[in-house]
Amino acid sequence: MLNIVCRVCGRQKICEKSLNLFDLVNRKYLKHLHMISGLRLVDLDDVPGFMCLCCQAELRSALAFRKLCIKTQTKWLTIEDDSSSGDEDTNDNSELESEKCAFSDFGKKKEGELVEETFQVLIEEEPMDKTLNRDAKAQLREDGIDEKCVPSQKIIKVSTKLDDQIYICELCGTHATSKPTFQRHMRKHRGERPFGCKDCDARFLSAGELRAHHRVHTGEQPFACRFCEKRYVSYMGRLIHERTHTNDRPYVCEECGKKFTTAYVLKNHMVIHTGERNFRCDICDRSFQRKAHLVTHTRSMMHLQNVKKQKS
């Protein structure tokens, strides 16, 4: 009986124009629902999986309203920046901090392309997993930043409780508990690696990663495992390794319940459920779920033969 009603509102009955939220072609609606409500809907047995026509219209309206809010606040921010650009009195900073906003420009957008603004927002939410907080603090240590001294940026304040504040990436829904961690994440989207090694061509997303990399050149390994004799160039490297001793697996797959030691391994696991094939070989017109599979393919005889055919 439940399967004939809408998953979102729970009231309207599904019809021919209702959408199956868990079809691959409709996954953008799950993303939009998460963007608006913060909820991650999961396909469950005996639970509706369709969204009714009314909720589709409500969702479009909510997305349009969100876009309008962002556009308007960007305009006010521009006016505020222009009016305060010539003011050198630092005592006025308290007024600016009363309404902080931050928006990221990702460069010129192609015509016809869906433009989706990205901004940082602080919201009230249940306390984050202690392990996630620990990982965020570890990243701060790697960056050499005191958590209490993180420089303030212009951010939309929705909550005044520091412990409840998180940063949300509006491109992918990722949550971060510290500003440096969020900034590092956004550099991934922009393709920025501003921290370059002086000894080689490697570039990194954060100063902490650069510092850890530099230890590869110096041979320094200051972070010793508390359970064995292994040593590591970074705090995070040691933390991840020690989970093999403690069997701590804080990253849980919402689809099947499997647990993993790092977010990276969980992300790789998720492609099994989503069926995404983001790594493509244009020469052979084939797509793969993992980068490693694509690399293996490029070494295959079939790929090499296709490369020769294309050159001839």
UniProtKB/Swiss-Prot annotation:
Domain ZAD: 4-79
Keywords per UniProt: Activator, DNA-binding, Metal-binding, Nucleus, Repeat, Transcription, Transcription regulation, Zinc, Zinc-finger
One GO cellular component term: nucleus
GO biological process: instar larval development; positive regulation of ecdysteroid biosynthetic process; positive regulation of transcription by RNA polymerase II; regulation of DNA-templated transcription
This protein's record includes keyword Transcription: yes
Tissue: Expressed predominantly in the prothoracic gland during embryonic and larval development.
Zinc finger (C2H2-type): 167-189, 195-217, 223-245, 251-273, 279-303
Gene ablation phenotype (knockout): Larval developmental arrest due to ecdysteroid deficiency.
Any matching Pfam family: zf-C2H2
Residues that coordinate or bind Zn(2+): 6, 9, 52, 55
Cellular location(s): Nucleus
Primary localization: nucleus
Extra remark beyond the main annotation: The name 'ouija board' derives from the instrument used for calling ghosts and is based on the fact that mutants cannot induce expression of the ecdysteroid biosynthesis protein spookier.
Protein known as: Transcription factor Ouib
Keyword Zinc-finger: yes
Gene3D superfamilies to which the protein is assigned, alphabetical: Classic Zinc Finger
Role this protein plays: Transcription factor required for ecdysteroid production in the prothoracic gland by activating transcription of the ecdysteroid biosynthesis gene spok. Binds to the 5'-AGCTTTATTATTTAG-3' DNA sequence in the spok enhancer region.
One MF term in the entry's GO annotations: DNA-binding transcription factor activity
